[in-house]
Regions:
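Structural preference for beta-strand elements that scaffold enzyme active sites
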Residues: 61, 97-99
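Short secondary-structure junctions
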Residues: 3-4, 117-121
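Conserved glycine-rich acetyl-CoA-binding loop
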Residues: 67-84, 93, 103-111, 115-116
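Conserved N-terminal entry element of GNAT/NAT acetyltransferase domains
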Residues: 1-9, 137-140
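Acetyl-CoA-dependent GNAT
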Residues: 8-72, 83-85, 89
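C-terminal "cap" of GNAT-fold acetyltransferases
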Residues: 39, 96, 103-110, 115-116, ...
């Protein structure tokens, strides 16, 4: 399994996985603008998953924006490998904390992040019936 930063030519595959994974997919133009923050995982020559993250708060905190794995490659540790690789990169950059926002109805994502060591630090009430959970992990 190879993990590397995305390139322009990878965006079509990212969009394909995006559309298979989320009811409201981000479009090509937006993904192109943030492509430096996309990490891909390959199985041979095939892109089978991605993680999008960004840094904020004077580059001491990072945020996971999205993680998605192609349906044919799910439950194989790909998302876990992407998060572990991101943590290595962030540690090298002296980033001390990473957070993620997860909707309360997405129990698999909540369990995934808890297994990775994230802790729920707050609940963000929404006008809809679904609340958001802010989860954080201290790095290093």
């Amino acid at each position: 399994m190879i993990i590397r930063a995305a390139k322009e030519e990878d965006l079509a595959k990212v969009i394909e996985i995006e559309k298979l994974s989320f009811p409201t997919a981000w479009d090509h133009d937006f993904l192109e603008k943030i492509s430096k923050d996309i990490f891909l995982v390959f199985n041979g020559q095939e892109v089978c998953g991605y993680l999008i993250a960004g840094c904020c708060h004077e580059n001491i905190v990072a945020t996971i924006l999205k993680v998605a794995v192609h349906p044919e490659h799910r439950r194989k540790g790909i998302a876990t490998n992407l998060v572990h690789k991101l943590l290595e990169i962030l540690k090298d950059r002296k980033i001390t904390e990473i957070d993620v926002i997860v909707i309360d109805e997405c129990e698999p994502a909540i369990l995934f992040y808890k297994k990775a060591g994230f802790k729920t630090v707050s609940t963000i009430p929404q006008a809809s019936n679904n609340d958001l959970y802010e989860m954080k992990l201290t790095i290093g």
